[in-house]
Protein backbone atom coordinates (compact mmCIF):
# COMPACT_ATOMS: atom_id res chain seq x y z
CA UNK A 1 0.00 0.00 0.00
CA UNK A 2 2.80 2.40 0.83
CA UNK A 3 4.41 1.79 -2.57
CA UNK A 4 1.13 2.50 -4.37
CA UNK A 5 0.55 5.64 -2.36
CA UNK A 6 4.02 6.86 -3.14
CA UNK A 7 3.32 6.28 -6.82
CA UNK A 8 0.13 8.34 -6.70
CA UNK A 9 1.55 11.18 -4.61
CA UNK A 10 5.07 11.27 -6.06
CA UNK A 11 5.93 14.92 -6.61
CA UNK A 12 2.44 15.68 -7.86
CA UNK A 13 3.14 19.30 -8.69
CA UNK A 14 6.89 19.33 -9.30
CA UNK A 15 6.86 16.52 -11.84
CA UNK A 16 4.52 18.27 -14.21
CA UNK A 17 4.43 17.54 -17.90
CA UNK A 18 7.45 19.13 -19.56
CA UNK A 19 5.19 21.28 -21.71
CA UNK A 20 4.05 23.28 -18.66
CA UNK A 21 4.58 26.97 -19.39
CA UNK A 22 3.40 30.44 -18.37
CA UNK A 23 -0.27 31.15 -18.96
CA UNK A 24 0.50 33.86 -21.52
CA UNK A 25 2.10 31.32 -23.86
CA UNK A 26 -0.89 28.95 -23.78
CA UNK A 27 -3.70 31.36 -24.68
CA UNK A 28 -4.83 29.60 -27.88
CA UNK A 29 -5.14 26.07 -26.44
CA UNK A 30 -6.78 27.50 -23.31
CA UNK A 31 -9.37 29.37 -25.39
CA UNK A 32 -10.04 26.20 -27.40
CA UNK A 33 -10.53 24.16 -24.23
CA UNK A 34 -12.82 26.81 -22.75
CA UNK A 35 -14.84 26.93 -25.97
CA UNK A 36 -15.24 23.15 -25.99
CA UNK A 37 -16.31 23.23 -22.34
CA UNK A 38 -18.84 25.96 -23.14
CA UNK A 39 -20.36 23.89 -25.96
CA UNK A 40 -20.18 20.80 -23.76
CA UNK A 41 -22.17 22.59 -21.06
CA UNK A 42 -24.68 24.37 -23.28
CA UNK A 43 -25.52 21.11 -25.05
CA UNK A 44 -26.76 19.81 -21.68
CA UNK A 45 -28.85 22.84 -20.71
CA UNK A 46 -30.15 24.06 -24.08
CA UNK A 47 -33.25 21.88 -23.69
CA UNK A 48 -34.46 23.97 -20.74
CA UNK A 49 -35.29 27.16 -22.70
CA UNK A 50 -36.42 25.08 -25.71
CA UNK A 51 -38.65 22.75 -23.70
CA UNK A 52 -41.97 24.66 -24.04
CA UNK A 53 -41.58 24.52 -27.82
CA UNK A 54 -40.48 20.87 -27.73
CA UNK A 55 -43.48 19.93 -25.56
CA UNK A 56 -45.90 21.48 -28.04
CA UNK A 57 -44.17 19.94 -31.04
CA UNK A 58 -43.93 16.41 -29.62
CA UNK A 59 -47.17 16.50 -27.64
CA UNK A 60 -45.56 15.45 -24.35
CA UNK A 61 -46.37 16.50 -20.80
CA UNK A 62 -44.25 18.07 -18.07
CA UNK A 63 -43.46 14.70 -16.50
CA UNK A 64 -42.10 13.22 -19.71
CA UNK A 65 -40.19 16.43 -20.38
CA UNK A 66 -38.59 16.23 -16.94
CA UNK A 67 -37.55 12.65 -17.65
CA UNK A 68 -35.55 13.88 -20.65
CA UNK A 69 -33.38 16.00 -18.35
CA UNK A 70 -32.87 12.97 -16.13
CA UNK A 71 -31.51 10.99 -19.10
CA UNK A 72 -28.93 13.69 -19.80
CA UNK A 73 -27.84 13.65 -16.14
CA UNK A 74 -27.75 9.85 -16.06
CA UNK A 75 -25.48 9.70 -19.09
CA UNK A 76 -23.30 12.51 -17.76
CA UNK A 77 -22.55 11.02 -14.37
CA UNK A 78 -22.16 7.45 -15.62
CA UNK A 79 -19.62 8.60 -18.21
CA UNK A 80 -17.88 10.94 -15.77
CA UNK A 81 -17.21 8.10 -13.33
CA UNK A 82 -15.99 5.86 -16.16
CA UNK A 83 -14.09 8.56 -18.05
CA UNK A 84 -10.75 7.09 -17.01
CA UNK A 85 -11.30 4.09 -19.28
CA UNK A 86 -11.50 6.42 -22.29
CA UNK A 87 -8.49 8.57 -21.40
CA UNK A 88 -6.44 5.47 -20.51
CA UNK A 89 -6.94 3.93 -23.96
CA UNK A 90 -7.16 7.11 -26.07
CA UNK A 91 -5.08 9.76 -24.18
CA UNK A 92 -6.69 12.92 -22.83
CA UNK A 93 -6.32 14.77 -26.13
CA UNK A 94 -8.26 12.19 -28.15
CA UNK A 95 -10.88 11.94 -25.40
CA UNK A 96 -11.55 15.69 -25.69
CA UNK A 97 -11.89 15.40 -29.47
CA UNK A 98 -14.17 12.36 -29.11
CA UNK A 99 -16.38 14.23 -26.63
CA UNK A 100 -16.96 17.10 -29.07
CA UNK A 101 -17.54 14.85 -32.07
CA UNK A 102 -19.97 12.48 -30.37
CA UNK A 103 -21.88 15.34 -28.72
CA UNK A 104 -22.32 17.06 -32.08
CA UNK A 105 -23.39 13.84 -33.80
CA UNK A 106 -25.90 13.07 -31.03
CA UNK A 107 -27.45 16.55 -31.25
CA UNK A 108 -27.83 16.10 -35.00
CA UNK A 109 -29.41 12.65 -34.47
CA UNK A 110 -31.92 14.12 -31.98
CA UNK A 111 -32.86 16.86 -34.44
CA UNK A 112 -33.85 14.36 -37.16
CA UNK A 113 -35.46 11.81 -34.85
CA UNK A 114 -39.25 11.57 -34.91
CA UNK A 115 -39.64 8.94 -32.19
CA UNK A 116 -39.38 9.48 -28.44
CA UNK A 117 -37.05 6.50 -28.07
CA UNK A 118 -34.67 8.00 -30.61
CA UNK A 119 -34.70 11.33 -28.79
CA UNK A 120 -34.19 9.63 -25.42
CA UNK A 121 -31.22 7.64 -26.72
CA UNK A 122 -29.73 10.77 -28.27
CA UNK A 123 -30.00 12.73 -25.02
CA UNK A 124 -28.41 9.88 -23.07
CA UNK A 125 -25.48 9.97 -25.51
CA UNK A 126 -25.25 13.78 -25.24
CA UNK A 127 -24.87 13.38 -21.48
CA UNK A 128 -22.26 10.64 -21.86
CA UNK A 129 -20.26 12.64 -24.42
CA UNK A 130 -20.24 15.62 -22.06
CA UNK A 131 -19.26 13.45 -19.10
CA UNK A 132 -15.96 12.23 -20.51
CA UNK A 133 -14.69 15.78 -21.16
CA UNK A 134 -14.14 17.37 -17.73
CA UNK A 135 -11.42 15.07 -16.25
CA UNK A 136 -9.47 15.09 -19.53
CA UNK A 137 -10.00 18.82 -20.04
CA UNK A 138 -8.63 19.74 -16.62
CA UNK A 139 -5.79 17.20 -16.86
CA UNK A 140 -4.79 18.73 -20.19
CA UNK A 141 -5.07 22.28 -18.86
CA UNK A 142 -2.92 21.62 -15.79
CA UNK A 143 -0.30 19.85 -17.92
CA UNK A 144 -0.02 22.87 -20.22
CA UNK A 145 0.21 25.63 -17.62
CA UNK A 146 2.72 25.88 -14.79
CA UNK A 147 1.24 25.31 -11.34
CA UNK A 148 1.61 28.95 -10.22
CA UNK A 149 -0.87 29.92 -12.99
CA UNK A 150 -3.39 27.14 -12.41
CA UNK A 151 -5.81 29.40 -10.55
CA UNK A 152 -6.11 31.90 -13.41
CA UNK A 153 -6.23 29.18 -16.07
CA UNK A 154 -8.96 27.25 -14.26
CA UNK A 155 -10.87 30.49 -13.64
CA UNK A 156 -10.91 31.20 -17.39
CA UNK A 157 -12.00 27.61 -18.06
CA UNK A 158 -14.76 27.92 -15.45
CA UNK A 159 -16.23 30.95 -17.21
CA UNK A 160 -17.71 28.50 -19.72
CA UNK A 161 -20.62 27.17 -17.61
CA UNK A 162 -21.41 30.60 -16.15
CA UNK A 163 -21.46 32.07 -19.66
CA UNK A 164 -23.62 29.13 -20.74
CA UNK A 165 -26.28 29.98 -18.14
CA UNK A 166 -26.55 33.45 -19.68
CA UNK A 167 -26.26 32.53 -23.36
CA UNK A 168 -28.57 29.48 -23.54
CA UNK A 169 -31.89 31.28 -22.94
CA UNK A 170 -30.90 34.33 -25.00
CA UNK A 171 -29.67 32.23 -27.92
CA UNK A 172 -32.81 30.11 -27.85
CA UNK A 173 -35.17 33.08 -27.86
CA UNK A 174 -33.33 34.78 -30.73
CA UNK A 175 -33.04 31.69 -32.94
CA UNK A 176 -36.62 30.56 -32.32
CA UNK A 177 -37.74 33.69 -34.16
CA UNK A 178 -36.49 32.15 -37.41
CA UNK A 179 -35.88 28.43 -36.78
CA UNK A 180 -37.51 25.44 -35.11
CA UNK A 181 -35.87 23.76 -32.12
CA UNK A 182 -34.62 21.00 -34.43
CA UNK A 183 -32.56 23.43 -36.54
CA UNK A 184 -31.12 24.97 -33.37
CA UNK A 185 -29.85 21.54 -32.30
CA UNK A 186 -28.37 21.00 -35.77
CA UNK A 187 -26.54 24.33 -35.53
CA UNK A 188 -25.21 23.49 -32.08
CA UNK A 189 -24.14 20.05 -33.30
CA UNK A 190 -22.23 21.50 -36.25
CA UNK A 191 -20.43 23.99 -34.00
CA UNK A 192 -19.58 21.20 -31.52
CA UNK A 193 -18.05 19.00 -34.23
CA UNK A 194 -16.16 22.02 -35.59
CA UNK A 195 -14.70 22.74 -32.15
CA UNK A 196 -13.41 19.17 -31.96
CA UNK A 197 -11.77 19.53 -35.38
CA UNK A 198 -10.28 22.88 -34.34
CA UNK A 199 -8.76 21.32 -31.22
CA UNK A 200 -7.39 18.43 -33.28
CA UNK A 201 -5.67 20.92 -35.61
CA UNK A 202 -4.64 23.75 -33.29
CA UNK A 203 -4.98 22.47 -29.72
CA UNK A 204 -2.02 21.38 -27.65
CA UNK A 205 -1.44 19.17 -24.67
CA UNK A 206 -3.15 16.06 -23.39
CA UNK A 207 -0.88 13.67 -25.30
CA UNK A 208 -0.64 11.34 -22.34
CA UNK A 209 -3.03 8.69 -21.03
CA UNK A 210 -5.14 8.98 -17.95
CA UNK A 211 -5.71 6.22 -15.44
CA UNK A 212 -8.79 4.08 -15.22
CA UNK A 213 -10.17 3.28 -11.75
CA UNK A 214 -8.16 0.17 -10.98
CA UNK A 215 -8.76 -1.45 -7.57
CA UNK A 216 -5.32 -0.44 -6.30
CA UNK A 217 -5.78 3.24 -7.16
CA UNK A 218 -9.33 3.30 -5.83
CA UNK A 219 -8.16 1.68 -2.60
CA UNK A 220 -5.55 4.41 -2.14
CA UNK A 221 -8.12 7.15 -2.82
CA UNK A 222 -10.71 5.67 -0.50
CA UNK A 223 -8.32 5.62 2.47
CA UNK A 224 -6.87 9.06 1.73
CA UNK A 225 -8.48 11.68 4.03
CA UNK A 226 -7.72 14.45 1.49
CA UNK A 227 -9.96 12.75 -1.08
CA UNK A 228 -12.95 12.67 1.26
CA UNK A 229 -12.28 16.21 2.46
CA UNK A 230 -12.32 17.37 -1.18
CA UNK A 231 -15.62 15.51 -1.72
CA UNK A 232 -17.06 17.37 1.27
CA UNK A 233 -15.65 20.74 0.16
CA UNK A 234 -16.99 20.30 -3.38
CA UNK A 235 -20.36 19.30 -1.92
CA UNK A 236 -20.44 22.60 -0.05
CA UNK A 237 -19.27 24.57 -3.09
CA UNK A 238 -21.80 22.96 -5.43
CA UNK A 239 -24.55 23.24 -2.83
CA UNK A 240 -23.94 26.98 -2.43
CA UNK A 241 -23.93 27.52 -6.20
CA UNK A 242 -26.05 25.03 -8.16
CA UNK A 243 -28.03 23.89 -5.11
CA UNK A 244 -29.15 27.39 -4.16
CA UNK A 245 -29.62 28.34 -7.83
CA UNK A 246 -32.04 25.41 -8.28
CA UNK A 247 -34.29 26.40 -5.38
CA UNK A 248 -33.93 30.20 -5.44
CA UNK A 249 -36.80 31.10 -7.84
CA UNK A 250 -39.23 29.01 -5.79
CA UNK A 251 -37.97 30.60 -2.56
CA UNK A 252 -38.34 34.13 -3.93
CA UNK A 253 -41.91 33.44 -5.09
CA UNK A 254 -43.17 31.32 -2.19
CA UNK A 255 -41.38 32.98 0.72
CA UNK A 256 -40.59 36.49 -0.50
CA UNK A 257 -43.81 37.07 -2.45
CA UNK A 258 -42.19 38.01 -5.76
CA UNK A 259 -43.92 37.60 -9.10
CA UNK A 260 -42.66 34.54 -10.93
CA UNK A 261 -41.49 36.54 -13.97
CA UNK A 262 -39.54 39.00 -11.80
CA UNK A 263 -37.98 36.19 -9.74
CA UNK A 264 -36.78 34.35 -12.87
CA UNK A 265 -35.45 37.55 -14.41
CA UNK A 266 -33.64 38.47 -11.21
CA UNK A 267 -32.01 35.05 -10.90
CA UNK A 268 -30.97 35.11 -14.57
CA UNK A 269 -29.33 38.55 -14.56
CA UNK A 270 -27.60 37.82 -11.25
CA UNK A 271 -25.49 35.24 -13.13
CA UNK A 272 -23.99 37.90 -15.41
CA UNK A 273 -21.93 39.38 -12.59
CA UNK A 274 -20.37 35.96 -11.99
CA UNK A 275 -18.45 36.00 -15.29
CA UNK A 276 -15.71 38.39 -14.17
CA UNK A 277 -15.52 37.57 -10.48
CA UNK A 278 -14.39 33.98 -11.11
CA UNK A 279 -11.20 35.22 -12.79
CA UNK A 280 -10.45 37.42 -9.78
CA UNK A 281 -10.79 34.30 -7.64
CA UNK A 282 -8.20 32.60 -9.85
CA UNK A 283 -5.76 35.48 -9.37
CA UNK A 284 -6.20 35.29 -5.60
CA UNK A 285 -5.70 31.51 -5.74
CA UNK A 286 -2.37 31.91 -7.54
CA UNK A 287 -1.18 34.55 -5.07
CA UNK A 288 -2.33 33.04 -1.78
CA UNK A 289 -2.79 29.35 -2.57
CA UNK A 290 -5.98 27.30 -2.93
CA UNK A 291 -6.50 26.64 0.78
CA UNK A 292 -6.44 30.31 1.76
CA UNK A 293 -8.63 31.24 -1.20
CA UNK A 294 -11.18 28.54 -0.34
CA UNK A 295 -11.23 29.76 3.24
CA UNK A 296 -12.25 33.23 2.13
CA UNK A 297 -14.84 31.79 -0.25
CA UNK A 298 -16.49 29.60 2.38
CA UNK A 299 -16.64 32.48 4.84
CA UNK A 300 -18.09 34.95 2.31
CA UNK A 301 -20.43 32.48 0.61
CA UNK A 302 -21.68 31.07 3.88
CA UNK A 303 -22.42 34.54 5.22
CA UNK A 304 -24.18 35.64 1.99
CA UNK A 305 -26.27 32.45 1.93
CA UNK A 306 -27.19 32.90 5.60
CA UNK A 307 -28.27 36.49 4.91
CA UNK A 308 -30.40 35.30 1.99
CA UNK A 309 -32.70 33.68 4.51
CA UNK A 310 -32.86 36.47 7.10
CA UNK A 311 -32.52 39.91 5.46
CA UNK A 312 -35.61 42.12 5.14
CA UNK A 313 -37.34 42.48 1.79
CA UNK A 314 -35.59 45.77 1.01
CA UNK A 315 -32.19 43.99 1.00
CA UNK A 316 -33.10 40.80 -0.83
CA UNK A 317 -32.20 41.97 -4.36
CA UNK A 318 -28.69 42.96 -3.25
CA UNK A 319 -28.13 39.57 -1.59
CA UNK A 320 -29.48 37.70 -4.63
CA UNK A 321 -26.70 39.37 -6.66
CA UNK A 322 -24.01 38.97 -3.99
CA UNK A 323 -24.56 35.28 -3.17
CA UNK A 324 -23.79 33.78 -6.62
CA UNK A 325 -20.78 36.08 -6.99
CA UNK A 326 -19.30 34.63 -3.81
CA UNK A 327 -20.32 31.04 -4.62
CA UNK A 328 -18.72 31.11 -8.09
CA UNK A 329 -15.37 31.94 -6.49
CA UNK A 330 -15.10 28.40 -5.09
CA UNK A 331 -14.35 26.56 -8.30
CA UNK A 332 -10.95 28.04 -9.32
CA UNK A 333 -9.32 27.23 -5.94
CA UNK A 334 -11.38 24.04 -5.61
CA UNK A 335 -10.22 22.57 -8.91
CA UNK A 336 -6.71 23.88 -8.32
CA UNK A 337 -6.56 21.98 -5.02
CA UNK A 338 -8.04 18.85 -6.57
CA UNK A 339 -5.48 19.02 -9.40
CA UNK A 340 -2.70 18.84 -6.82
CA UNK A 341 -3.79 15.43 -5.59
CA UNK A 342 -1.70 13.01 -7.63
CA UNK A 343 0.59 13.34 -10.67
CA UNK A 344 -0.81 14.28 -14.10
CA UNK A 345 -1.50 10.67 -15.09
CA UNK A 346 -3.94 9.96 -12.25
CA UNK A 347 -5.57 13.34 -11.59
CA UNK A 348 -8.54 12.40 -13.73
CA UNK A 349 -9.45 9.61 -11.28
CA UNK A 350 -9.82 11.96 -8.28
CA UNK A 351 -11.93 14.36 -10.35
CA UNK A 352 -14.11 11.68 -11.95
CA UNK A 353 -15.08 10.38 -8.50
CA UNK A 354 -15.08 13.61 -6.49
CA UNK A 355 -17.40 15.60 -8.75
CA UNK A 356 -20.27 13.06 -9.14
CA UNK A 357 -20.34 12.29 -5.41
CA UNK A 358 -20.26 15.98 -4.54
CA UNK A 359 -22.96 16.81 -7.07
CA UNK A 360 -25.29 14.21 -5.60
CA UNK A 361 -24.88 15.83 -2.19
CA UNK A 362 -24.58 19.51 -3.09
CA UNK A 363 -26.76 19.57 -6.19
CA UNK A 364 -29.30 17.00 -4.99
CA UNK A 365 -29.49 16.61 -1.22
CA UNK A 366 -29.11 20.30 -0.34
CA UNK A 367 -31.96 21.65 -2.53
CA UNK A 368 -34.08 18.64 -1.54
CA UNK A 369 -33.47 19.42 2.13
CA UNK A 370 -34.33 23.09 1.66
CA UNK A 371 -37.50 22.08 -0.15
CA UNK A 372 -38.48 19.69 2.64
CA UNK A 373 -38.07 22.45 5.24
CA UNK A 374 -40.05 24.76 2.96
CA UNK A 375 -42.93 22.26 2.98
CA UNK A 376 -42.94 22.51 6.78
CA UNK A 377 -43.01 26.31 6.65
CA UNK A 378 -39.30 26.87 7.33
CA UNK A 379 -38.05 27.89 3.88
CA UNK A 380 -35.98 30.79 5.17
CA UNK A 381 -34.49 28.58 7.90
CA UNK A 382 -33.43 26.02 5.29
CA UNK A 383 -31.58 28.66 3.26
CA UNK A 384 -29.83 30.05 6.33
CA UNK A 385 -28.87 26.57 7.56
CA UNK A 386 -27.09 25.94 4.28
CA UNK A 387 -25.13 29.14 4.89
CA UNK A 388 -24.02 27.84 8.27
CA UNK A 389 -23.08 24.46 6.79
CA UNK A 390 -21.03 26.14 4.05
CA UNK A 391 -19.05 28.05 6.68
CA UNK A 392 -18.15 24.71 8.29
CA UNK A 393 -15.84 24.23 5.31
CA UNK A 394 -13.36 26.39 7.23
CA UNK A 395 -12.98 23.55 9.73
CA UNK A 396 -12.44 20.93 7.01
CA UNK A 397 -9.77 23.08 5.35
CA UNK A 398 -7.69 22.84 8.51
CA UNK A 399 -7.31 19.09 7.91
CA UNK A 400 -6.74 19.22 4.14
CA UNK A 401 -3.20 18.21 3.20
CA UNK A 402 -1.95 19.27 -0.24
CA UNK A 403 1.49 18.57 -1.76
CA UNK A 404 3.86 21.50 -1.60
CA UNK A 405 3.92 23.64 -4.72
Task: Give the role of each language-model region.
Residues 79-91, 278-289, 374:
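Helix-to-loop junctions at the C-terminal end of transmembrane segments
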Residues 78-114:
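Conserved MFS/SLC helix-loop-helix module at the cytosolic interface between two early adjacent transmembrane helices
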Residues 291-334:
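C-terminal transmembrane helical hairpin of 12-TM major facilitator-type secondary transporters
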Residues 157-200:
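Helix-loop-helix hairpin linking two adjacent transmembrane segments in secondary transporters
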Residues 122-160:
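Cytoplasmic helix-loop-helix junction between adjacent transmembrane helices
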Residues 345-376:
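A late C-terminal transmembrane helix in Major Facilitator Superfamily
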Residues 47-48, 226-274:
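Extracytoplasmic gate region of multi-pass secondary transporters
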Residues 15-23, 205-230:
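Juxtamembrane intracellular "pre-TM" segments in multi-pass secondary transporters
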Amino acid sequence: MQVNKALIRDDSVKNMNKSSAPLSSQVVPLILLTGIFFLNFISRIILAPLMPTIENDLGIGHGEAGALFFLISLGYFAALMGSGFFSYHLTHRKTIILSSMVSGAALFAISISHTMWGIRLGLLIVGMAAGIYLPSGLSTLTSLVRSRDWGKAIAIHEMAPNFGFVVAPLLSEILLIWFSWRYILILLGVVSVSSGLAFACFGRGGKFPGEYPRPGILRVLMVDPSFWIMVALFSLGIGASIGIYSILPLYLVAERGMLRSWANYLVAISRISVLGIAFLSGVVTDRLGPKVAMGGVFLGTGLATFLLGVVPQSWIVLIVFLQPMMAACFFPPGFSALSRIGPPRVRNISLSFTYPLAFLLGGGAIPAGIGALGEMGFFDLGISLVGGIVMSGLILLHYLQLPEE
